[in-house]
Amino acid sequence: DVENYPGFPSGIMGPELMSNFRAQAERFGAELLTKKVTRVNLHTSPFEVWVGDPSSNEPTFTAESIIVSTGAKALMLNLPKEIELVGHGISTCATCDGFFFKDQEIAVVGGGDSAVEEAMFLSRFASKVTIIHRRDQLRASKIMQDRAFANPKIKFLWNHQVTEYIGDTKLEGVKVQNVTHQTESVLNISGLFIAIGHTPNTSIFEGQLSLHENGYIKTESDSSRTNIDGVFACGDVQDFTYRQAITAAGSGCMAAIDAERWLEEQHAG
């Protein structure tokens, strides 16, 4: 479910929201193709885009302008039953799902700023938040660590990793292993938030678009412009701070306006 998108007071299923987006775009004449882009050439004009065989001599499409909105994937633990339990106790977004765990005991996996930020936010709702970290100290900034250590609702399980999910239709707990002594125990929780990072889908743009060290596309301040004139980026592929559906939609609007204005400039006169 998507519970924090404006206009849907009772929430809306993600696929339904996407279907609505698609129908609205098509009503205004957009052509949507479900295909995988395997190669791009942004060093030529018009830009070249390959779908299917990337070794083909001829590109599938050419374009005067391109908007990149390939998103980012949350890193997961890749344990059995994980996919089935996402949305049924397992989440990667505290701001999306935290409210549903009011007065419950939950856990966060990770040790960086993102994990601590998630835990701090979740402590507003949950009765207890356990940060599970495979090392004996956090990687988060000192100010974030100090805030977490001072929060009475946040506890820490050091030198542990999650090895198994307990529950079939909903999460009922996790099995954790001490990475030092190899001993195992069970943590009875109703929610697990995985905060071990995200991977932006930018591999086909490497060597062409300027990327941050973490792989996200660099854009100009207050703009969707990239380092290549005529190429714009929006959504989670360039935003590693907010990562919300509403901010992605807003930046998509920015990119559309930026691209439209750029095209008008190219054809002016």
Show where each model-derived region lies.
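Glycine-rich Rossmann-fold phosphate-binding loop(s) that bind the pyrophosphate
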Residues: 110-112
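Conserved FAD-binding subdomain of flavin-dependent enzymes
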Residues: 5-33
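Conserved N-terminal glycine-rich FAD pyrophosphate-binding loop of Rossmann-like flavoproteins
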Residues: 1-15, 141-150
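A Rossmann-like FAD-binding core segment of flavoenzymes
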Residues: 22-63, 124-221, 228, 261-269
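Generic hydrophobic/aromatic pocket-lining and core-packing "Φ" positions
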Residues: 119-120
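Redox-cofactor binding/interface segments in oxidoreductases and associated redox assembly factors
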Residues: 68-69, 108, 194-195
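N-terminal Rossmann-fold NAD(P) dinucleotide-binding loop
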Residues: 115-116
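FAD-site-proximal beta/loop scaffold in flavoenzymes
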Residues: 73, 78, 83-100, 188, ...
